[in-house]
């Protein structure tokens, strides 16, 4: 079954190892085989992997687009996941979902789950910041 892709004007995407850049008009085409596909907005650059959750996303992305080096990325992934679970055990259900998708070699789905981890990580940071502000206000009162 074909995958229909519609690119907006000037949009870029990764198909396999090729970067595709669209021209001035919307373009539509079909992918006939199984190959890694990422839209520009889904691609995280290494310098953006600035938190543990973002590092997980980045490593899953690398597993997806560079399966030849899967083992290297997978080992690093587990190092980070262990640290995350030790620091924030409440992340375990999300990480379990990510791992389930990776085990099934559904890397795109694992990336979607990793987005949930990034969002949850931000919620934890925001909650910790709010708690810190509340504690400071209580001390100065």
Indicate residue ranges for each PLM-predicted region:
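Terminal leader/tail segments of proteins
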Residues: 1-141
